[in-house]
Amino acid sequence: RKVTAGNCGKCHVKEYQEFMKSRHSIGWQRMLECGKLMALPKDTCSEKCEQCHNIQFKCDSCHTRHTFSTLEAKTPEACRTCHMGSDHPHYEAYISSKHGTIYTASQSMILKESQSVQSLRSPVCVTCHMPQGIHDMSFGLTRGPAGSGLSYVDRNGATIDDIELAKKREDMLSVCNTCHSLRFAKKTLTIADDMHKNIGAVIGEARDMILDLEKEKQLFPSLGEMTKIPLASHAFILGDLHVYTGKSRMERLFITLTQSAAVTWKGAYHENP
């Protein structure tokens, strides 16, 4: 019998309620709705996609069996398994930033089980994304994927209005302000916002080029000849994440562009030059 997050929630009520507000709690659902992933061979999807997206059902993705250590869950290495790679290089952006460099260089100061992350010289993932130990990892996030053409949405797919986005930004600034001046934090995040916007414009221009090529019947194979999937073929090709199945050369170049873009804008928010 599998132990689910709901089982843990019978005792850890507060943590479970916070988890259910986070995007982690809809990881499996989002995977099933993602045609580009469902189009992959079943064994590939099982071995790759499902190993991270199954976090929707359990707590031991972060504090693993059989110790369920809170210390383990506090470390960047616990996040690394899923939050790395060409499509979402969060760990790489953090660990090679100045924050990550200090963390790596001061491993002799590694946390003891009873300590808090405030004991470290530098912030780790949970310092900013799970302040005070909250289990809603969407804390303070105000930007969606660059070039997606979509406003930032909540876990239910509803667009978050400007008032709520402003509040989330203030929440994140309050975390930055723990170590940095508010002026410095605002300037840094504004620069990252501009980077995100500029990259989105470049991706949008490239996307339009591909669609124009399709209209002119210059895309081989054409979008209409793509592997049958539950989403529209344009969403499959030009959405946030990408796979190489059945792609034309132009689309493969577009995939490379989006991967480079992810490194750039995620690096900006993690203060990685």
Regions found by a protein language model. Give the residues of each.
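Short sequence/structural segments immediately N-terminal
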Residues: 1-273
